[in-house]
Regions:
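Solvent-exposed, low-complexity, repeat-rich "mucin-like" stalks and linkers
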Residues: 111-144
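Exported/periplasmic cell-wall-interacting domains
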Residues: 2-112
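Solvent-exposed, conformationally flexible loop/turn segments
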Residues: 1, 125-129, 161-162
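Serine/threonine-rich, repeat-prone extracellular segments and beta-strand-based repeat modules
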Residues: 122, 144-182
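Short beta-strands and strand-coil junctions in structured, solvent-facing domains, enriched
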Residues: 57-58, 139, 172-176
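Short, isolated positions in well-ordered beta-strands
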Residues: 18-19, 130, 146, 178
């Protein structure tokens, strides 16, 4: 690639334009240019389409040569699948240098996952109001705050005494899911 960098699963679109992973400094899975990875979803290349390893590998394995691909370049109409969200890698992470979606079995991100914290059983008096998200936080696989993505489900009423179960779930940008319950 350009500037003596490397890419995984380069797949030609047309001419000099490719689908490929974010650049790597060497031909090794742990040399990802993390700053460039964090630009996924923005204009950051010389015309190629940069993707996380999971997605470009899917194209590489599932789209034979000659497959028609429609590329959307319109924020108002990002296509039928929408614009994918990307996860950000903290530059000071000991796992920086690895794409969190790389299926390589030695990828240290595979030991990480989305998390929920602060979910605990509570007691509420009849007639009181309750904030099920009070004190509850969530982090994605890379440790970024995704508290605003928490979904809470369950049936309850504060009009009558009883025991109710509420379920919490959060899914991060790479599909890692954390769940918890409280009563």
């Amino acid at each position: 690639m350009v500037d003596n960098t490397y890419g995984h699963y380069a797949y030609r679109i047309s001419g000099g334009y490719l689908f490929h992973s974010v650049p790597y400094l060497k031909a090794a899975n742990n040399t990802l240019e993390t700053e460039e990875y964090n630009k996924l979803g923005t204009f950051a290349s010389l015309g190629c389409v940069r993707m996380c390893v999971r997605d470009v590998l899917w194209l590489y394995e599932n789209c034979p040569q000659g497959t028609t691909v429609d590329i959307y370049d319109d924020a108002a109409n990002p296509g039928p699948l929408g614009k994918p969200e990307s996860i950000k890698i903290p530059l000071d992470s000991p796992n920086a240098g690895w794409d969190p979606t790389d299926p390589d079995e030695t990828n240290p991100w595979h030991k990480e996952s989305a998390t929920l914290s602060g979910v605990q059983d509570i007691t509420v008096k009849v007639g009181d109001t309750v904030d099920f998200l009070k004190g509850v936080t969530a982090k994605d696989t890379c440790g970024n705050d995704i508290t605003d993505k928490i979904a809470v489900s369950g049936r309850y009423t504060t009009d009558a005494a009883g025991e109710y179960t509420m379920k919490y779930q959060v899914t991060d940008a790479i599909g890692s899911i954390a769940t918890a319950e409280m009563k």
